[in-house]
């Protein structure tokens, strides 16, 4: 959440605490830890939108793996979402599905390949663009973009450009992200 000038955020103690944290820090992460490793939302997306200019919701994690296909109950995209960004790590390209993908059986089904299949830029683009993959649950009124992350080496950058080209052929805009060498190891934006 990023701070907003709006003060119409409700009167509950939680909403007051969120508002105070936003005013003090400008950026706040909200959620409740459950099952030891999961984070659940804190308040409805509509309530959070009244408190902040921007609300980012992680609707579908990948267990820290660079690529995935969602389960039948994923992703949990709030109906009020304006935009959805599917994220893929470029370290997945050139690696076997069974090694770098969360829910590899679903990835294999979408690609028509086995767990030993080595992912190509076309595979990554197909997974991101698929209504059963990265585009799953995206409403027609929602903007859809892809973030091609971890393009930190020349080879990964080339893979990212290839994936971006394949996505562009499908009318999907993407952004390529990476750290420069001097930014690695401890960069904190906030």
Question: Can you describe what each PLM-predicted range is?
Answer:
Residues 1, 173-183:
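A generic structural motif
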Residues 1-32:
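N-terminal phosphate/diphosphate-binding loop that engages ATP/GTP or pyrophosphate donors
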Residues 2-12, 53-65:
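Generic detector of solvent-exposed, compositionally biased contiguous segments
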Residues 9-11, 29-32, 44, 120, ...:
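Residue-identity detector for threonine
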Residues 24-28, 50-55, 83:
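Loop/turn-to-beta-strand initiation segments
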Residues 29-32, 55-59, 65, 86, ...:
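General beta-strand structural signal in soluble alpha/beta enzymes
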Residues 37-50, 60-171, 181, 187-190:
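Conserved catalytic-core segment of NTP-binding enzymes
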């Amino acid at each position: 959440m990023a701070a907003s000038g709006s003060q119409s955020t409700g009167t509950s103690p939680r909403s007051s605490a969120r508002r105070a944290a936003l005013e003090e820090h400008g950026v706040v992460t909200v959620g409740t830890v459950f099952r030891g490793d999961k984070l659940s939302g804190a308040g409805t997306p509509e309530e959070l939108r009244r408190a902040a200019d921007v609300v980012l919701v992680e609707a579908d994690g990948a267990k820290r793996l660079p690529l995935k296909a969602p389960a039948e109950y994923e992703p949990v995209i709030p109906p009020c979402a304006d935009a959805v960004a599917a994220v893929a790590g470029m370290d997945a390209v050139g690696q076997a599905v069974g090694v770098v993908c969360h829910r590899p059986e679903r990835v294999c089904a979408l690609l028509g390949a086995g767990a030993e299949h080595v992912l190509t830029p076309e595979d990554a683009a197909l997974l991101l663009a698929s209504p059963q993959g990265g585009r799953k649950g995206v409403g027609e009124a929602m903007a859809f973009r892809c973030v091609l992350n971890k393009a930190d080496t020349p080879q990964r950058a080339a893979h990212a450009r290839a994936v971006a080209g394949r996505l562009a052929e499908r009318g999907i805009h993407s952004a390529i992200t990476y750290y420069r060498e001097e930014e690695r190891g401890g960069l904190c934006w906030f």
